Amino acid sequence: MFIEQRIYTAHPGKLPAWLKLYEEVGGPCSVRHLGPPIGFFTVEFGTINRVLFVRGFDDIDDRERQLAAREADPEWVRFRTETAKIGALAVQETKLLKTVPFSPVQKAGQAFERKIGGTGLVVDHRTYDFHPGKMNGWIEAYERIGLPVQQRLLGQLLFFGVTECGPINQVVFAWAYEGLGDRDRRRNTMAADPGWAEFMKTVGQLGPLKQQTTMVLKPTAFSAIR
C-alpha cells in the first residue's frame, strides 16, 4: 500500500486556529472522500508549530479521484476559504511512501489497535537517509536481526515505509510509547541487549546511513492513533 505523509508548518500562534478548523470542517470532509487518516499529530520535539499526518491508499489512482471529489465539495471550499483568512500555514511538505512487508499497516482504513499499556501516548517518528545502494541491505538486516529485538523491548511499531516520491533512499517509520519516560527506559534496555549489539555490528559493516532524523509527536484529539 501507499502512505502519504504530510507535514504542515504554521506561523507561530496560528496552529491552534488551523487545527480547530480542520477538526470541525476540513477533517470530516477529508474522511468523507479519502477515508480516515492513519494518524494526526502535532510536533512536540523537533521543528515546532507543525502538524504531521499520514493517510493510506491501496491504489494510488484512487487518490487522484478522491482528491478531485474533495476539491469539489462545498465544505472543502469553505475550509480552504476560512484557513486562508487566518493565514496559518507557512510551509507544506508531502512525500509518498510504500509500506514494507513487516509494516503493521498494510491496508487503507485499517483500524488502529492499541497494544501498549497506560493511557498516554507519544510517537517517536524516524527518518533515515541512506547512501545510494545501501538501503536494501540495511532493511534486510533490520527485519532479520534488529526488528525482533525492538518488538521484544520497545513500544508499538505503527508503520514502516520507504520513500517512493520525495527524497529517495529513505525509510520512514514510527513507534508509539506510553510517554517519554517509557521511551527512554525501553531504548536504554534495547541499547544494552546483545541482539541489538549484533544488529549494530552487522549494519556498521555496511556503512549505509547518511543521516538520521527523529521527532517526538503527540496525537491530536481527533487522531485515530492515541
Protein language model features and the residues they cover:
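Short S/T/G/P-rich N-terminal loop/turn motif that feeds into the first structured element of a domain
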Residues: 1-198, 202-226
